[in-house]
From Swiss-Prot:
Modification comment: Proteolytically cleaved in the N-terminus by SpoIIGA to yield the active peptide.
Name of the molecule in the record: RNA polymerase sigma-E factor
Pfam families per record: Sigma70_r2, Sigma70_r4
Organism of origin: Bacillus subtilis (strain 168)
Motif window: Polymerase core binding: 86-99
Function: Sigma factors are initiation factors that promote the attachment of RNA polymerase to specific initiation sites and are then released. This sigma factor is responsible for the expression of sporulation specific genes.
Length: 239
């Protein structure tokens, strides 16, 4: 089961990369003005109720008014050698994903869910940063966590068995990708599921898919390019 979960995560990630979506892309928060204050419980609740209806204004406010949370979490990783502005930018990607995928019906606060997504986005970036691995001692204290405990580099980088973090990563990106896939018709979805093994099966070649569907490989190739272009547009609307 564990190997299956990791394999499925890899397949989803592979498709995300095919769509041109990279988790380590950096988006900067410009300006020097003070960040807006957090929302009150009632204000947040009103905005959350509008999310399922696709209210983009509510989405934007929820993101903006939770930027202080991004800064707070980013400062936990200041001693990793990464510029604080970069950490905030990366964490903001996690915040956007959190707001896009948050389910108001679940018994969890947005701040709690967003904190996990923000921290996970930063952790994923740090894992891919070879400069940290080579220049900082693996057991060197980096900072103090929220509970007052020393935060070691080994805690930040984790291991391949860090299933909790992998699950958050998979759930956030897969949820966004599933929303994009829902915009496809049945044949288009079938092609993507077969090509990228999205339903637990092995990945199929274009020739395999063509044979299974009774059409030419060149036609499958053209369809796949068109579908990926469409998926990229749908995904970019949500991220």
């Amino acid at each position: 089961m564990k190997k299956l979960k990791l394999r499925l995560t890899h397949l989803w990630y592979k498709l995300l990369m095919k769509l041109g979506l990279k988790s380590d892309e950096v988006y900067y928060i410009g300006g020097s003005e003070a960040l807006p204050p957090p929302l009150s419980k009632d204000e947040e609740q009103v905005l959350l109720m509008k999310l399922p209806n696709g209210d983009q204004a509510a989405r934007a406010i929820l993101i903006e008014r939770n930027l202080r949370l991004v800064v707070y979490i980013a400062r936990k990783f200041e001693n990793t050698g990464i510029n604080i502005e970069d950490l905030i930018s990366i964490g903001t990607i996690g915040l956007i994903k959190a707001v896009n995928t948050f389910n108001p019906e679940k018994k969890i606060k947005l701040a709690t869910y967003a904190s996990r997504c923000i921290e996970n986005e930063i952790l994923m970036y740090l894992r891919r940063n070879n400069k940290i691995r080579s220049e900082v001692s693996f057991d060197e204290p980096l900072n103090i966590d929220w509970d007052g405990n020393e935060l070691l580099l080994s805690d930040v980088l984790g291991t391949d068995d860090d299933i909790i973090t992998k699950d958050i990563e998979a759930n956030v990106d897969k949820k966004l990708l599933k929303k994009a896939l829902e915009q496809l018709n049945e044949r288009e979805k079938q092609i993507m599921e077969l090509r990228f093994g999205l339903v637990g099966e092995e990945e199929k070649t274009q020739k395999d898919v063509a044979d299974m569907m009774g059409i030419s490989q060149s036609y499958i190739s053209r369809l796949e390019k068109r579908i990926i272009k469409r998926l990229r547009k749908e995904f970019n609307k949500m991220v």
